[in-house]
């Protein structure tokens, strides 16, 4: 608080004091000096801005949602590219149209040079192979569809001429696993051609009718569903099949290795 006082003016001439002495004696006493009290003004502070917590939390939420949407877009784009480009290329690499030259040493005639063609589909993830043998140009076997299921350990032959299915345990000494067979065919596709190869023969006998095809697995089930299906047993000892015995046998020539296999199915019903 500041105190300000106002004093009355003092006469500047001494003579006036004497003249006014008498007058001042009779005059009333002068009024006290006027005082004015001034209160210092309060300092004005800038208003304090309070930030709301809700606005910052909302900004974080919007940012998080934006990141989630961006990540989802990247995931869907990756799935699209994988499905329509990578899988398509992989499918093309797993389908093969193959041909192999071999000497037919099983023929009664002199050894002749033969060619065998087949379409191969290899399913690496499902671990099975599917082979289609078209009608041979120069005889030597029936057209057939063959499935080698390495998960079930089974092989199924669908003789297209008879429209019948035959199932037997998978012979892993003859049939290459899907990965090895795929590598072999990829080398052939790249130009590393198979040399002229040879043919071996295996003989099988029909044993019993199969009624429960679902127990054979989904791959063989789809191949043999709606067809008469029979079990086969591999003949342990080789025997020479004459012309009379050959009438009761059907031959399917195929290859899943570096050589050709002739599968004889005998006792066909």
From Swiss-Prot:
**Residues modified as Phosphothreonine:** 39
Cross-referenced InterPro entries: BRICHOS_dom, ITM2
A biological-process GO annotation: neuron differentiation
Transmembrane segments annotated in the record for this chain: 57-77
GO cellular component, alphabetical, reads: Golgi apparatus; lysosomal membrane; lysosome; plasma membrane
Glycan-modified residues: 171
Mind listing the UniProt keywords for this protein, alphabetically? Cell membrane, Cleavage on pair of basic residues, Disulfide bond, Glycoprotein, Lysosome, Membrane, Phosphoprotein, Signal-anchor, Transmembrane, Transmembrane helix
**Protein family (similarity comment):** Belongs to the ITM2 family.
Q: How does it assemble?
A: Interacts with BACE1. Interacts with APP. Interacts with STMN2.
Q: Which protein are we looking at?
A: Integral membrane protein 2C
């Amino acid at each position: 608080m500041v105190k300000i006082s106002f004093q009355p003016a003092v006469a500047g001439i001494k003579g006036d004091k004497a003249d006014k002495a008498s007058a001042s004696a009779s005059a009333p006493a002068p009024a006290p000096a006027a005082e004015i009290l001034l209160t210092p003004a309060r300092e004005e502070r800038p208003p304090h801005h309070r930030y709301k917590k809700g606005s910052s939390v909302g900004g974080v939420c919007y940012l998080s949602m934006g990141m989630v949407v961006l990540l989802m877009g990247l995931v869907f784009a990756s799935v699209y590219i994988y499905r329509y480009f990578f899988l398509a290329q992989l499918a093309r690499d797993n389908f093969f149209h193959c041909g192999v030259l071999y000497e037919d040493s099983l023929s009664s005639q002199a050894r002749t040079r033969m060619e065998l063609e087949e379409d191969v589909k290899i399913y690496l993830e499902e671990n099975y192979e599917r082979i289609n043998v078209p009608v041979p140009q120069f005889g030597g076997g029936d057209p057939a569809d063959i499935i080698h299921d390495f998960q079930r350990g089974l092989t199924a032959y669908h003789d297209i001429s008879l429209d019948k299915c035959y199932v037997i345990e998978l012979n892993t000494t003859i049939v290459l696993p899907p990965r090895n067979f795929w590598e072999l065919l990829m080398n052939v596709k790249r130009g590393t051609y198979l040399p002229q190869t040879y043919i071996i023969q295996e003989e099988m006998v029909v044993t019993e009718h199969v009624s429960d095809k679902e127990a054979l697995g989904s791959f063989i089930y789809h191949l043999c569903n709606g067809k008469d299906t029979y079990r086969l047993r591999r003949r342990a000892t080789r025997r020479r099949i004459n012309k009379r015995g050959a009438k009761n046998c059907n031959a399917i020539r195929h290859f899943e290795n570096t050589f050709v296999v002739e599968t004889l199915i005998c006792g066909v019903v």
